[in-house]
Amino acid sequence: TVPTGKYDAERLANTSNNFYTYKPLFSFTWLPTERTELSLKATYSFNMENHDTDYRSGQIFHFDYSASYRVTDNLRLGLNGYYLKQTTDDKQNGETVRVFGFGEEVDDGVRGQVFAIGPAVHLTFLKYASAEIRWAKEFDVENRPEGDMLWAKLTIPFEL
């Protein structure tokens, strides 16, 4: 990932994270039968330092997964989700980051983690067009915002 966009260390939200991330990726899809599909995409993120803040986010292992069954030629139902685990500490000025929460100091390097699982529906129509909706409930969340993920995609091919 390349740090594009505007960055200001004084702002809470920015369009850039102001550091490079090297992220090797591995993915595969297995079709054990004509109607079933199992897919996995795994990455490992090596984050570089943000030189404006002397902050370096920890390394992150992450994977997305899905399993689906083709009910009809136009309808697939399944499960989907993701897992994320930060494997090294966040550091600032070379020191492990410590935060205070609920009146106690948390000395875990702000290592984030989350697991999510939920249903998925994929519908094909008009020969090659498709619509997909996925929802996932997050569990076992640490050191990151917690919530549910809702993802919708509409694909309509066209010719030039």
Regions found by a protein language model. Give the residues of each.
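Outer membrane beta-barrel transmembrane domains
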Residues: D54-L160
